Amino acid sequence: MKKVSVIAAAVAATLAAGSAFAVDFHGYMRAGVGVNADGGQQLTFEKNKVGRLGNESDIYGEIQLGKEVYNNNGKTFYVDSMLAMTSNGSNDWEGTAANCGLDGTKVKCVDDAQFALRQFNVQAKGVLNFAPEATLWAGKRYYQRHDIHISDFYYWNISGAGAGVEGIEAGPGKLSFAWVRNDRNDNFNSGMGSGDTPDVGNGGSVNVNTLDVRYAGIPVWENGSLEVGLDYALVNETEDASKAAKDAKDGVMFTAELTQGLDSGFNKTVFQYGTEGYSKAFAFYGDGSWYGAEARDGASGYRFINWGVIGLGDNWELGHQLVYGVGEDMWAADHKWEAMSAVVRPVFKWDDNHKTIFEAGYAIDDNDGDENKYGKLTVAQAWSAGSSFWARPEIRLYASYLTADKADNSNTFDSGRSDDTFQFGVQAEAWW
């Protein structure tokens, strides 16, 4: 009996230790294999504009581990972390070591895979006496991201290293404040795409600090809510900065998002307006994290978005996006860039685990009258863990047709020999 008691105590201690060291485990992945009718691997083509189904050539994954490390008298501290990786899936072993080969007469080296630290932060709740319901945070994190899943298009996302307070109860809604760093680490000249190193005094990049304030959860009518936010991009150049960096202007971005809950889904309508460098976000499907500091003084832009998912009877669901964005005076006076996109994804559910998915996308980039047009048609058979539009994991067998009509009559596919192409493959996607 004594031996049994010792074993029981050991088992109990082991279980208790396991509970003490348990962590929250979340993640995302997509991976698969595909080929292109022109030869070679499948490609990714303007997926933010024409849709992502059957249009992703990468392997991408996120592993998120978090743990509540303190909980006492209503006060909690939580440590969160995330690692991400991406590759083209070309080999069994994909790491950071460079693979070198001949590219014509030159040796070209590329990394098989890239790894990144996407999140590492501390979140404290109940520690602010004036707002015990709010969360105080600092570190690197995904910050209240807004995206359209069917095109992988993030339209409001200032994620990065920073600090803030979120979820302060204020009237009918909740207030959040954040300060996030979004440096420009590429070269630019004012009014052009490349040139001088922006700021030698800051490691070659221009320091951009984004100040963000949001008021969310404002009830407007039955099942309808409003979120509004303001982002201020502060360009913080040093004395060693280039003239272009010193001439760069701070910018403001305003966002309003109306969410309407429906009996069988939801719909979101978004309006955004920005000045100076934020004008480029609306012309080029940006999210506010990349600030176009080289934009011409006085540039501005705006964007309208409508997207959502709705059930159509017992067997059909439909996801869609409509985007219209404008950037004005970005490079020269009276210059206008218009970006337009329409994507629909109807899903027919055969049973709880089997679907047929269609996706069609069409987009136009109008550069002062010079139009580039893009299109995509995809059909896929999918097996998923449930019948919902959002059910994952999901394995898909797909075929896609891609087309491009350029203003300069150049060809996009088959190494510049064709204006359309076809590809097929298999992809798995999961989140947990």
UniProtKB/Swiss-Prot annotation:
InterPro entries: G_neg_Bact_CarbUptk_Porin, Maltoporin, Porin_LamB, Porin_LamB_sf
Compartments reported by the entry: Cell outer membrane
Gene3D superfamilies: Porin, LamB type (2.40.170.10)
Signal peptide range: 1-22
Bilayer topology term: Multi-pass membrane protein
GO BP annotations listed: monoatomic ion transport
Cellular component, GO annotation: cell outer membrane; pore complex
Annotated family: Belongs to the porin LamB (TC 1.B.3) family.
The protein's role, per its UniProt record: Involved in the transport of maltose and maltodextrins.
Protein name: Maltoporin
UniProt organism field: Vibrio parahaemolyticus serotype O3:K6 (strain RIMD 2210633)
